[in-house]
C-alpha cells in the first residue's frame, strides 16, 4: 500500500503570488514534473488553495516518503531547485494533517 500525506501550508503575506505563479508554471512544465516525481517514487501530488486564499493544502502519495525525501534532497533536476526556492519564498509550514483513512482501487 502506498503512503499518503496532506499538509496545510500558510502562504507568506506579500508573497502569495509567487506560489500561485509557480503553480501555473508547473502545469506548463508537466513533463519535467512527472520525471522528477518518478525519480522520487511519488505517485501523485496535488496542491489546493484554501477558500480564504491564505493557505494551501498539499497532498502527496508515494511508495515511500523516506525514499522520496532522499531523492529530493539529492536531486540535480533544475525544477527541484526552483521548487525549493519558490517554497522557501512563499510558504511556511503550518501543520501536517492526520490520516484517518486512505483507500486505493487500482487496476
Go through each PLM region and give its residues.
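Short, conserved charged micro-motifs
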Residues: 14-20, 66-70
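General beta-strand recognition
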Residues: 55-57
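An amphipathic, aromatic/His-enriched active-site/gating alpha helix that lines ligand/cofactor pockets
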Residues: 32-43, 61-98
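N-terminal secretory/targeting leader peptides
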Residues: 44-53, 63
Amino acid at each position: 500500500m502506498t503512503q499518503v500525506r496532506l499538509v496545510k501550508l500558510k502562504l507568506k503575506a506579500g508573497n502569495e503570488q509567487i506560489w500561485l505563479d509557480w503553480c501555473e508554471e508547473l502545469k506548463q512544465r508537466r513533463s519535467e514534473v512527472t520525471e522528477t516525481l518518478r525519480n522520487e517514487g511519488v505517485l501523485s501530488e496535488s496542491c489546493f488553495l484554501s477558500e480564504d486564499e491564505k493557505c494551501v493544502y498539499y497532498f502527496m502519495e508515494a511508495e515511500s516518503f523516506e525514499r522520496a525525501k532522499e531523492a529530493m534532497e539529492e536531486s540535480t533536476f533544475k525544477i527541484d531547485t526552483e521548487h525549493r526556492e519558490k517554497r522557501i519564498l512563499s510558504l511556511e509550514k503550518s501543520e501536517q494533517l492526520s490520516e484517518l483513512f486512505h483507500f486505493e482501487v487500482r487496476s
